[in-house]
UniProtKB/Swiss-Prot annotation:
It comes from Escherichia coli. The keyword Iron does not apply. Could be required for the biogenesis of a putative fimbria. Transmembrane segments: none annotated. Keywords: Chaperone, Fimbrium biogenesis. One of its GO terms (biological process) is cell wall organization. Belongs to the periplasmic pilus chaperone family. One of its GO terms (cellular component) is outer membrane-bounded periplasmic space. The keyword Chaperone applies. The gene is fasC. This is Protein FasC.
Amino acid sequence: MIMGQLMNMRELFNKKKLHALVFSMWCVNLHASSLSDGIAIEPFEINAKSNRFVEFKVYNNTDEDYIVTQKVVSEENSIKKAKIPFVVNPPIRLLRKRSDAAMGIIYLNEGEVFDKKRKYYLSVSFIPKKKDSDDLGFNIIFTQQIAVKLSALN
């Protein structure tokens, strides 16, 4: 009789473990699906070549429209106001909800010495488009910086 009760308890315990496992898998799946909504840039690093257009993509997997701005910055630029040898195209654009768009940069080699030590970053900002009905509040601007590597001159 005691053995029968132990077997029933073991079976009940295993069922509870199974229910806990299924519940935790459901929670993880629910959490993962909510992480897929957002804004993103691809790739995570850009390899620029002299006078060539390098494309990257911006993604909007949300139900909001965003104004996207881009520029190339460097550590030296903030200190010395150095000239940035890049052109961005387009510098600003509207990114509709649940869409993606191609953007790009061009490295302009204007006879300057190629310096691999110089660090450049593509700074992309996502500004939520404000609705006319939104009288109060403020928008949160999301900014992401991506390393721009300079390839050897061709």
